[in-house]
Amino acid sequence: MTRTLLTDIAVATADHSKYGEEVLGLFRFKDETAFFEKASKIFPGVVLLETCNRVEILVHGSAKQLRDFLHGEQRFGFDILEGEAALMHLLELAAGTKSMIIGEDQILGQMRRALLLAESHDTNDVITDVCLNTAIREGVSIRQKTSINKGAVSIGSAAVLLAEELMGDLDGKNILVVGGGEMGTLVARALCEKNLRAIYVTNRSFDRAVLLAEEIKGRAMRLDQLYPCIALSDVVISCTGAPHLIIHADELAETMNERFWPLDLEPRHLLLIDIAQPRDIDDACRDVPGVSLKTLDDLKSISEKNLAARKTECEHADVLVKAALPEFIKAFNRAASGDLTKNLYTWAEEIRQREKNKALSRLRDADPYLESVIDDLTSALTKKLLEDAAKSIRASAECTDTQTAEILLKAIISGEVSCIRRSE
């Protein structure tokens, strides 16, 4: 098979399509700093993307290197793609065709944040950068050319649809949203469209809860009032970014004792929906009388309905993804050839300095002006001599003629005389 990429690229992926919520949690890296420190010793570029439905690792390196690294970290079961397949995967990811909720826009923001995270750890090189940025641009373009995201639901709004499905309707209900971040905002905005009695918002930062509550005309509650607020609610949707549990079974059981109407034999039913990753709600809560607990895995019914409704647009997006791949490969090879030519100029500069110093040592009485002239002359000659070769390397790479690009570079560096003519 002809090699079309000038350097190695690989992606490890684990997502909702293959693994349930609990198993997917085993693929995550709790200590991001440690992950980047270890990975950066192996790969020139590495990006980590973790969402509630997927874990993705993009590296400037080979599939074997990535697999060996993950096995060393006791992470088994990732699907690993390399070369063109890795680029195609990134395009599909950005287009929203691999999302649990087909066409959702949140993946684009998540990919941007993954880049920023890599940059903050100094692990984003020119190759990983061009991969993510090109994929994101194509994802935006595909949404503009199709209706794949028109009226599409997010994970947050899917949780609201699930609540509506399970409760019959949400008219006159009290809803508590736990978490005021991006996902909590999506949930709260989706709830605004319903005929609710009240929306409560609680968050670790009370100021953030107040801002969100003002936007949706709800009521902000301090986190220390969580359980009293649960006692008032019919549905609780939890979506914080906390690394620990927020709602515990024993405290919830005590709260349920406050949910009896006079003469009732059982507490009023409480629906809990946990869309956080890691989980916010203790799984033992499902054993508390009167409580139903739903998680990300339960959103699949909403996802399947969404996919059926967007089948035609998804097919259109797939066509556009395939059409975008050749230009993606050109952009990739352009970036990779930049690295190649940079190495070429570095090699040439070392030779220039060495030979210049030899010449100056023979001119024992050379004054600073003469030294400056010789330095300028050798520098200009080096750049002129390499200019055409560098252009040829870049042109060959962009045309996916990686073999010619590599032959040119090796021929120059090894001192071989090589003349490669292209037919017009």
From Swiss-Prot:
Its EC number is 1.2.1.70. Homodimer. Keywords: NADP, Oxidoreductase, Porphyrin biosynthesis. The active site is at 52 (nucleophile). PANTHER family: GLUTAMYL-TRNA REDUCTASE. The lineage of its organism: Archaea, Methanobacteriati, Methanobacteriota, Stenosarchaea group, Methanomicrobia. The gene is hemA. It catalyses: (S)-4-amino-5-oxopentanoate + tRNA(Glu) + NADP(+) = L-glutamyl-tRNA(Glu) + NADPH + H(+). One of its GO terms (molecular function) is NADP binding. During catalysis, the active site Cys acts as a nucleophile attacking the alpha-carbonyl group of tRNA-bound glutamate with the formation of a thioester intermediate between enzyme and glutamate, and the concomitant release of tRNA(Glu). The thioester intermediate is finally reduced by direct hydride transfer from NADPH, to form the product GSA. Catalyzes the NADPH-dependent reduction of glutamyl-tRNA(Glu) to glutamate 1-semialdehyde (GSA). This is Glutamyl-tRNA reductase. NADP(+) binds at residues 179-184. InterPro entries: 4pyrrol_synth_GluRdtase (IPR000343), 4pyrrol_synth_GluRdtase_dimer (IPR015896), 4pyrrol_synth_GluRdtase_N (IPR015895), GluRdtase_dimer_dom_sf (IPR036453), GluRdtase_N_sf (IPR036343), NAD(P)-bd_dom_sf (IPR036291), Shikm_DH/Glu-tRNA_Rdtase (IPR006151). Belongs to the glutamyl-tRNA reductase family.
